[in-house]
Amino acid sequence: MAKQEYKQLPKRSEVHSATEQFKDTIKTSLGLDLFKGLGLTIKEFFSPSVTIHYPMEQLPLSPRYRAVHHLQRLLDSGSERCIGCGLCEKICTSNCIRIITHKGEDNRKKIDSYTINLGRCIYCGLCAEVCPELAIVMGNRFENASTQRSQYGSKSEFLTNEQDAKNCSHAEFLGFGAVSPNYNERMQATPLDYVQEPSKEESKEETPTRSESHKGDENV
């Protein structure tokens, strides 16, 4: 282990008399430290402001920002995307998602209740990642402060408006949990992707026809 060497700084002489205190004050006031602080203050005074008048003004958030959840609908039909599989409820680390379902006449799950306790949620985004239908996603509504300890969110608060989905007034979700736009370019090719199948023209050239094979037999 390397030996650490410490450099001891000279101790500052103690000031006792009033004359020495006055000299020390003048030296500190007219030294470089004062002008450095004033220079920084003047520089920041004339620099452009980085603050905004919240809540009248709000900064744009990233599309992958993790805030209050949002339940999606199909854009064309307006049907709910959630199939009631319960994966979001099982993977939730804070145990804040509660789903109650029943089996319908068509032997498919029907959702009776879907609640999220926003007071317990840590907004990790695991529910959005595990959802196979992209039904639950992370939105950008971060103003969810409440004076009540038991703060629950019902399904109607998170669900997209059916008429907006049918009219396609909103685009497909591109936030946290969605597939990246350039996912094809980022995917790594598997060994099977390098095996190229022969084209039809090459297979015709390599495989002789029946008439040519019969002519070869007659010549023999």
From Swiss-Prot:
Residues recorded as binding [4Fe-4S] cluster 2, renumbered to this chain, are: 92, 121, 124, 127
Which residues lie within the region annotated Disordered? 187-220
Catalytic reaction list: a quinone + NADH + 5 H(+)(in) = a quinol + NAD(+) + 4 H(+)(out)
Biased composition regions of type Basic and acidic residues, renumbered to the chain: 198-220
Pfam families, from UniProt?
Answer: Fer4_7
Cross-referenced PROSITE patterns? 4FE4S_FER_1, 4FE4S_FER_2
Give the domain of life.
Bacteria
Domain 4Fe-4S ferredoxin-type: from-to ranges? 71-102, 112-141
Question: What EC number(s) is this enzyme filed under?
Answer: 7.1.1.-
GO cellular component annotations, sorted alphabetically?
A: plasma membrane
Signal peptide bounds? none
Listed binding positions for [4Fe-4S] cluster 1 are: 82, 85, 88, 131
Q: Which UniProt keywords apply?
A: 4Fe-4S, Cell inner membrane, Cell membrane, Iron, Iron-sulfur, Membrane, Metal-binding, NAD, Quinone, Repeat, Translocase, Ubiquinone
Q: Provide the cofactor note recorded for this chain's UniProt entry.
A: Binds 2 [4Fe-4S] clusters per subunit.
Q: How does it sit in the membrane?
A: Peripheral membrane protein
Name the protein family.
Belongs to the complex I 23 kDa subunit family.
Q: Which HAMAP family match?
A: NDH1_NuoI (MF_01351)
Tell me, in a sentence or two, what this protein's role is.
NDH-1 shuttles electrons from NADH, via FMN and iron-sulfur (Fe-S) centers, to quinones in the respiratory chain. The immediate electron acceptor for the enzyme in this species is believed to be ubiquinone. Couples the redox reaction to proton translocation (for every two electrons transferred, four hydrogen ions are translocated across the cytoplasmic membrane), and thus conserves the redox energy in a proton gradient.
Please give the name of this protein: NADH-quinone oxidoreductase subunit I
Q: Lineage from the top down?
A: Bacteria, Pseudomonadati, Campylobacterota, Epsilonproteobacteria, Campylobacterales
Annotated gene: nuoI
